Amino acid sequence: MSVAVLAFGLNHTSAPVSVRERVSMPVDLVKPALEGLRATFGGAVREAAILSTCNRTELYCAAEGQVAEHLPAWLAEHNRLEAAALRPHLYRHQHDDAVRHAFRVASGLDSMVLGEPQILGQMKDAVRAANEAGALGTLLHQLFQRTFSVAKEVRSQTAIGAHSVSMAAAAVRLAERVFGQLEDARTLFIGAGEMIELCATHFAAQRPRSMVVANRTIERAETLAGRFSAQTMKLADLTERLAEFDVIVSCTASSLPILGLGMVERATRQRRHRPMVMIDLAVPRDIEPEVGRLDDVYLYSVDDLGRLVQSGTDARRAAVVQAEAIIETRVQGFMHWMQSREVVPVIRDLHQAADDVRAAELERARRMLARGESPEAVLEQLAHGLTQKYLHGPLAALNRSEGDERRQLLAWVPRLFPGRDSRR
């Protein structure tokens, strides 16, 4: 049975953060998810990889049969959701559409921030996790290697990454909307990953009054804080110290909210209702959405920042056209490679059949020589036997055919035996 490439999932355009956070998969859960997927579908899912970020959860797989029809139910069951509630937010791509989607994602064309570079690293992490789980094979390995190559080509030959308004820069803009200049702002960063590092870089450029990094692992917090002359604190101290901060930016891998309504409500009272800007870049969310109902709190989710960064995409629209052209060419190249793989078993069988004929005729020739027959007669018989057996299949097919089938076979004769036309 033939194997197809599938890309399946949801992203920031098809699902709000309230849905995305429910199917988000931390790195440590990707391996068991892949194992569960392959156990569910058996050999029908040959290869698989899961890409899960703040803005998307996608499954890439090499699969056979009707697997694609059952993936929504699997994803819903895996995350303990109702399939009917999840299905409207899902998309599915197959064959060349799946390849095109992978190329566009890695190139930043499908990102909330058009042209953002982080997605390429996230996709490489996803491939590494799939490989460590033993879920990658020749097909997806080749797909992702070409995906990374295409992304590099797009970035080097177009301006897709230029004029980018990043999520980190958008976070600064949102804080400035409330406080104006940030010189007097006390800023807290919760987490110590790449996104927090980017945000800290942008906020540090505004020279806020203070910057503090809180993280579950204090050593990582100290490493990040050292870059910006910031202080550190333990997550356990958030309850006591939250009221100190004017701006809170959070992005952790926690599966449960870190800042709840009660904690923030107490902090606003301690602040005597001075405003707080809270920017939640995590999926699943670090801050309970109910916090946004408090009068003195300006809560922004990753989707809110996404709407802000869209204003910076106009200057890159021309680059998108160039990028799409590059991607289309590379998609066709990959599909040609896939089709050539389908021919390989046929070519192998043809070679084996020809070798079997050759071996049989050689053995016959050796027996004739052993009986003392003349070499000339043996060579004549060998050539005749090879010719008859090699042509038996094509001639039998021609004799059995009729109508359009015969015309098609006759049209192929000059291509299969290219010297034929010149002898007419």
UniProtKB/Swiss-Prot annotation:
Domain notes per entry: Possesses an unusual extended V-shaped dimeric structure with each monomer consisting of three distinct domains arranged along a curved 'spinal' alpha-helix. The N-terminal catalytic domain specifically recognizes the glutamate moiety of the substrate. The second domain is the NADPH-binding domain, and the third C-terminal domain is responsible for dimerization.
Q: Of which family is this protein a member? A: Belongs to the glutamyl-tRNA reductase family.
Q: Which species expresses this protein natively? A: Bordetella parapertussis (strain 12822 / ATCC BAA-587 / NCTC 13253)
What GO MF terms are annotated? glutamyl-tRNA reductase activity; NADP binding
Q: Its Enzyme Commission number?
A: 1.2.1.70
Protein name per the record: Glutamyl-tRNA reductase
Q: Give the metabolic or biological pathway.
A: Porphyrin-containing compound metabolism; protoporphyrin-IX biosynthesis; 5-aminolevulinate from L-glutamyl-tRNA(Glu): step 1/2
What reaction does this enzyme carry out catalytically? (S)-4-amino-5-oxopentanoate + tRNA(Glu) + NADP(+) = L-glutamyl-tRNA(Glu) + NADPH + H(+)
Q: Which residues form a coiled coil?
A: none
Q: Which InterPro entries match?
A: 4pyrrol_synth_GluRdtase, 4pyrrol_synth_GluRdtase_dimer, 4pyrrol_synth_GluRdtase_N, GluRdtase_CS, GluRdtase_dimer_dom_sf, GluRdtase_N_sf, NAD(P)-bd_dom_sf, Shikm_DH/Glu-tRNA_Rdtase
